[in-house]
From Swiss-Prot:
Organism domain of life: Bacteria
UniProtKB keywords: Aminoacyl-tRNA synthetase, ATP-binding, Cytoplasm, Ligase, Nucleotide-binding, Protein biosynthesis
Gene this protein is translated from: gltX
Source organism: Pseudomonas fluorescens (strain ATCC BAA-477 / NRRL B-23932 / Pf-5)
Protein name per UniProt: Glutamate--tRNA ligase
Pfam families: Anticodon_2, tRNA-synt_1c
Single GO cellular component term: cytosol
Length: 493
């Protein structure tokens, strides 16, 4: 009997997302329920955005939750390397195999040519897609351009008629017309693969038997199925999990809710409660009880109990469930966990240099730096009253800073400072008028340690969370303002 092997394959391009943890949990439970193996693979082919720091955060977040893997970049295994950036030669080999078999082809189109192609198609009312012009090149022309070292990508051929039947473990057979599929790029000009080629090659070579992924990937499933067919490989069984959603039913995103696992760890949530809550996202125990452990979920796991309705990720409900877990702890363990959370040595070492020179006794630390250990800070609305800025200007400033910080790739003091400075200058304001407002939003106080240092230490999710709280305190942002201010956002350097 074949051993069940599942995997999670996140991209290390930002904070570890609760959606990644959710999909990892269901893959883990499915594998363990069947006595199988759960694998961690890192999809880091986006070299511009991928970082080892983000990769380590993924490791830390999953381990904090209690989701462990038997093979991966940090523990090794018989099917490595487990970072896609280290498997380039493997992908080159299989991309060339597809070309040799006539299932893929080199495309020499420049970005300008592709832009013009799409513009012309849109002008005709057509769906923009690659038109296959490289297929018209003669073999001699292709060989000449390849020999000359001309930059090119490798694209896959796709049928233009009929439908692809996608066998989904939750929905049954799903029919998707082939004419919705583009001639997907498989290998980029830099020699690295796109998601589609790397995904299929890795899953095959690593012996993955079942793939549980988010339903956002269902529309592109025919490309993966076609690649398995082209290679002559047996494809894994596919399961497309319902997406996590905000309380307003929109797709879960950091613009409306904190989405980083690290945020919830920093807020003092228990990993058991977090896993418990993620386990209830579209799934339920046979006896319908709300509180259960990871092992209990594994023991009772059955995909037939997954509901296709979009599960709502609600922080208030998560907080309620976390309270159930906290109150069930023995008092001694409760005290121990509080100490571990509040007096984390690494975190304290980040804070200490900014506090030590400002206090005369230890008792003065809490009033000065207590905000480092809080979730929200609930500032007094009077702290946002400005002699130079109107109430609308304050809200606009805070909202634009929040949006710009959401796209910040490197969370460091210098980049945070530059971001705030850029917003302030774009609104023709003075930094000295803006910073007291940031103090109020981030620390809940009129003054404290450097707010820029504090933002760096608190991290992106807690910082953004507090900015959102401040904006809500001041009345929020209307749909009209949201639309108008987003136009300003694009002009900020």
């Amino acid at each position: 009997m074949t051993t069940v092997r599942t995997r999670i394959a996140p991209s290390p391009t930002g904070d570890p997302h609760v959606g990644t943890a959710y999909i990892a949990l269901f893959n883990y439970c499915f594998a363990k329920q069947h006595g199988g193996e759960f694998i961690l693979r890192i999809e880091d082919t986006d070299q511009l955005r991928s970082t080892r720091e983000s990769e380590q955060q993924i490791f830390d977040a999953l381990r904090w939750l209690g989701i462990n893997w038997s093979e991966g970049p940090d523990v090794g295994g018989p099917h490595g390397p487990y970072r896609q950036s280290e498997r380039g030669d493997i992908y080159q080999k299989y991309a060339q195999q597809l070309v040799d078999l006539g299932h893929a082809f080199p495309c020499f189109c420049t970005a300008e040519e592709l832009d013009q192609m799409r513009a012309e198609q849109m002008a005709r009312g057509e769906t923009p897609r690659y038109d296959g012009r490289a297929l018209l090149l003669s073999k001699e022309e292709v060989a000449r351009r390849l020999a000359a070292g001309e930059p090119h990508v490798i694209r896959m051929k796709v049928p233009t008629e009929g439908v692809c039947v996608v066998p989904d473990m939750l929905r049954g057979d799903v029919e998707i017309p082939w004419d919705r599929m583009d001639m997907q790029v498989l290998m980029k000009t830099d020699g690295l693969p796109t998601y589609f080629l790397a995904n299929v090659v890795d899953d095959h070579l690593m012996g993955i038997t079942h793939v549980l992924r988010g339903e956002e990937w269902l529309p592109s499933a025919p490309k993966l199925i076609l690649l398995y067919e082209y290679f002559g490989w047996e494809q894994p069984q596919l399961c497309y999990m319902p997406l996590l959603r905000n309380p307003d039913k929109s797709k879960l995103s950091k613009r409306k809710n904190p989405t980083s696992v690290t945020f919830y760890e920093r807020m003092g949530f228990m990993p058991e409660a977090m896993l418990n809550y993620l386990g209830r996202m579209g799934w339920s125990m046979p006896d319908e009880r709300e509180k259960f452990s990871l092992q209990e979920m594994v023991d009772n796991f059955d995909l037939s109990r997954v509901s296709l309705g979009g599960p709502i990720f609600d922080i208030e409900k998560l907080s309620w469930l976390n309270g159930q877990w906290l109150r069930d702890l023995p008092v001694q363990e409760f005290a121990s966990r509080v100490q571990t959370w509040a007096l984390n040595p690494d975190y304290m070492m980040k804070i200490a240099p900014h506090v030590q020179g400002r206090v005369e006794t230890f008792s003065q630390i809490a009033p000065l730096a207590g905000f480092f250990f809080a979730g929200g800070v609930n500032p007094d609305a009077k702290l946002f009253e400005s002699k130079k800025l109107s109430g609308d200007q304050v809200r606009q400033l805070m909202q634009l800073i929040l949006w710009k910080l959401e796209s910040l790739r490197q969370w460091e003091k210098d980049s945070i400072t530059a971001t705030i400075q850029a917003v302030v200058e774009s609104l023709e304001l003075k930094l000295r008028d803006a910073m007291p407002l940031m103090f109020a939003a981030i620390t809940g106080q009129a003054s404290s340690v450097s707010v820029l240092d504090a933002m760096e230490i608190l991290g992106p999710d807690l910082t953004r969370f507090r900015l959102r709280q401040a904006i809500d305190l001041l009345g929020g942002v209307s749909k009209k303002e949201n639309k108008e201010w987003e136009k300003l956002l694009g002009a900020i350097a």
